Amino acid sequence: MSKGILQVHPPICDCPGCRISSPVNRGRLADKRTVALPAARNLKKERTPSFSASDGDSDGSGPTCGRRPGLKQEDGPHIRIMKRRVHTHWDVNISFREASCSQDGNLPTLISSVHRSRHLVMPEHQSRCEFQRGSLEIGLRPAGDLLGKRLGRSPRISSDCFSEKRARSESPQEALLLPRELGPSMAPEDHYRRLVSALSEASTFEDPQRLYHLGLPSHGEDPPWHDPPHHLPSHDLLRVRQEVAAAALRGPSGLEAHLPSSTAGQRRKQGLAQHREGAAPAAAPSFSERELPQPPPLLSPQNAPHVALGPHLRPPFLGVPSALCQTPGYGFLPPAQAEMFAWQQELLRKQNLARLELPADLLRQKELESARPQLLAPETALRPNDGAEELQRRGALLVLNHGAAPLLALPPQGPPGSGPPTPSRDSARRAPRKGGPGPASARPSESKEMTGARLWAQDGSEDEPPKDSDGEDPETAAVGCRGPTPGQAPAGGAGAEGKGLFPGSTLPLGFPYAVSPYFHTGAVGGLSMDGEEAPAPEDVTKWTVDDVCSFVGGLSGCGEYTRVFREQGIDGETLPLLTEEHLLTNMGLKLGPALKIRAQVARRLGRVFYVASFPVALPLQPPTLRAPERELGTGEQPLSPTTATSPYGGGHALAGQTSPKQENGTLALLPGAPDPSQPLC
């Protein structure tokens, strides 16, 4: 409105600006001119001694004619005089504002309108009042400057009130010593300019508002046409200003008690508008009528401090500006910290969402890159690009993402069984480090590598027997992805190397930690020691229902559940897909046998996975395909689980043999109990 700020006020508002602008409010408030204000508004008994001096207008007892009337209740006449003066303030305020809306600044017109609305009398006291006011202006200016707070009202109010109140009731002491010409010596425009410059210094908006409502002197500079109640002695006015300044510093609540005309809504808005900047000192005189009584803005300025706002007026949460205060931070948390906190929370939320939406293989790839970026180059160089198998594996991974198990996706690798079996883990390690010299050399090195590092990037694809790789790749990937079948601890870690991503790393797939208690890792798991031989994984997916039943029966404590597997028709294709929840709820297995079965299946698939379904997704080496039995028999049996010792201290029985029965006994290894000596079932 007056300063170009968009103000949103209720349809019926008592603020000064709305009185001017709204015809509805003008008409409604015009009725208030004749309605007596309640005593609570007019008589502020709690006022400080600055207001306690006797009125001085009726009995002349006061030292000056400018004492605020009736605030210290003395007798009936004083109270009546004060009421009339307060009403006069209302009248002059409304009438002058109506005139100012039309840019009519003619003081005589306003005064005459006031005279008409109020039955003013005693015009003969004008000269005395002017004279008295002139003297008071001279005396009060230094006192007002001390605080730098010019608690002034617009000249329109002062001029109108002066004439009407001077005419109404003047004490005989108003005609004292000063010559009459001192009174009208300052023009209203000059006085207003001085007021505007004073207000622009450091005053809060409430100061002029409060004085406007109470009819207090506007900083002692009021020209002689100010009304008598404005003129207090300099020491009294200084006390008034000090009190107002202290109230403004305490916050809006300190001023609310002293605003006689402020309704609850207006007090709230004034509280919001605390510490408003004063009007521009260079304001043009044309806007003088509308600049001073500016309505309290509904929106707080950007730099307004927010500590004084009540909790019900503050923004609802951190970092979120609202219409009431547009700075994100307030009170206990500075804006910068609030913004940083909100930014961090949003970043975490986005990262979590992205992690949930990422396909398993992409997530695994990202984890691997972040964990071992230096190993990715050799891995990619060594890994043959088999588009068909890669697509198949990715499809299996996505299908198996259904479980809540960690996303342990297998990296895409070349066909696993493309090469002969890996004779020894040591040789296998050497081969991948060399860059996969030859299928044969890579196989021996891979066997060691599988056990020790479980590197999928090794030439293990060549090392694995083709038969194993065909069905086992997708299946193993699926199992690894699923990761919920802890009982499926990888038994053919060496075979997984063929698909392994890291050719030269001793840790499986660049695990950030050497051995984690959360992973059930045998030699197959890729955590096997250098001397261990990784058991070759076998193609579980080719098992029949009888093979699965024999495998389950060969596991200690699981024989009683073979009937359930047979009834449900679980074969090699579906066995790796069984989650712990399926085994426990749908098939009625107990926790121990269920975990054991899943661990053994995982071992046969050459997969290491987190038995406890830890939510963190960790890259794991894909299952290594074990060499065919014939190849194993040729002297490459070191790959069998029997030779390979699990990190838990037990050697694993030969897992490389294709028959599940043989591996059942040997692979029935739980994280703490590998049984290398178990007979092959």
From Swiss-Prot:
Compositional bias ranges of the Pro residues kind: 412-423
SMART domains listed in its UniProt record: SAM (SM00454)
Leader sequence residues: none
Compositionally skewed regions (Polar residues) per UniProt: 637-646, 656-665
Chief site of localization: nucleus
GO cellular component: nucleus; PRC1 complex
Keyword Zinc among UniProt keywords: no
Pfam families for the chain: SAM_2 (PF07647)
Record has Glycosyltransferase as a keyword: no
Tissue specificity: Expressed in the outer and inner nuclear layers, ganglion cell layer and rod photoreceptors of the retina (at protein level). Widely expressed, showing the highest expression in kidney, prostate and retina.
Highest rank taxon of the organism: Eukaryota
GO function terms (MF aspect): chromatin binding; DNA-binding transcription repressor activity, RNA polymerase II-specific; histone binding
Domain SAM: start-end pairs: 543-608
Modified residues (Phosphothreonine): 485
Sequence ranges of Basic and acidic residues compositional bias: 219-234
SUPFAM superfamilies: SAM/Pointed domain
Record-listed Phosphoserine modification sites: 640
Cellular localisation: Nucleus
Any one of the GO BP annotations: negative regulation of DNA-templated transcription
InterPro entries per the UniProt record, alphabetical: SAM, SAM/pointed_sf
Disorder: Retinitis pigmentosa: A retinal dystrophy belonging to the group of pigmentary retinopathies. Retinitis pigmentosa is characterized by retinal pigment deposits visible on fundus examination and primary loss of rod photoreceptor cells followed by secondary loss of cone photoreceptors. Patients typically have night vision blindness and loss of midperipheral visual field. As their condition progresses, they lose their far peripheral visual field and eventually central vision as well. Retinitis pigmentosa can be inherited as an autosomal dominant, autosomal recessive or X-linked condition.
Subunit organization: Self-associates. Component of a Polycomb group (PcG) multiprotein PRC1-like complex. Interacts with SAMD7 and PHC2.
Record's protein name: Sterile alpha motif domain-containing protein 11
Organism of origin: Homo sapiens
Source lineage: Eukaryota, Metazoa, Chordata, Craniata, Vertebrata
Gene name for this UniProt entry: SAMD11
